[in-house]
């Protein structure tokens, strides 16, 4: 069953807030900007992670130095998974944060 528009927006809002919370609590030197549904994480070295919502597809998109990734929400598992690799958003985000900032953060709750 496809996500309703309202459910999709609630999920993306909660996910983006959880991502912000992890970075805020980490003490890592990053700039966070959330505007018009787009969350941008700017690392000290200038690299960025950009999270945006694609409402027609009901996907959360992530743009990073290593490429662009599209995530579908699995209601049964309560998690976002990449539509091409099945890698979980939490795992990919932890890996990318380590690659870009050298920090080992836990995103398992997103």
UniProtKB/Swiss-Prot annotation:
Task: Tell me the GO BP annotations in alphabetical order.
Answer: iron-sulfur cluster assembly
- List, alphabetically, the GO terms of the cellular component aspect: cytosol
State the superkingdom.
Bacteria
What terms describe the molecular function in GO for this protein?
ferric iron binding; ferrous iron binding
For this UniProt record, the keywords arranged alphabetically read as follows: Iron, Metal-binding
What the entry lists under InterPro entries is as follows: CyaY (IPR047584), Frataxin/CyaY (IPR002908), Frataxin/CyaY_sf (IPR036524), Frataxin_CS (IPR020895)
Task: Kindly give the Pfam families that the UniProt entry links to this protein.
Answer: Frataxin_Cyay (PF01491)
What protein family is recorded? Belongs to the frataxin family.
What job does this protein perform? Involved in iron-sulfur (Fe-S) cluster assembly. May act as a regulator of Fe-S biogenesis.
Name under which the protein is recorded:
Iron-sulfur cluster assembly protein CyaY
The scientific name of the source species is Pseudomonas syringae pv. tomato (strain ATCC BAA-871 / DC3000)
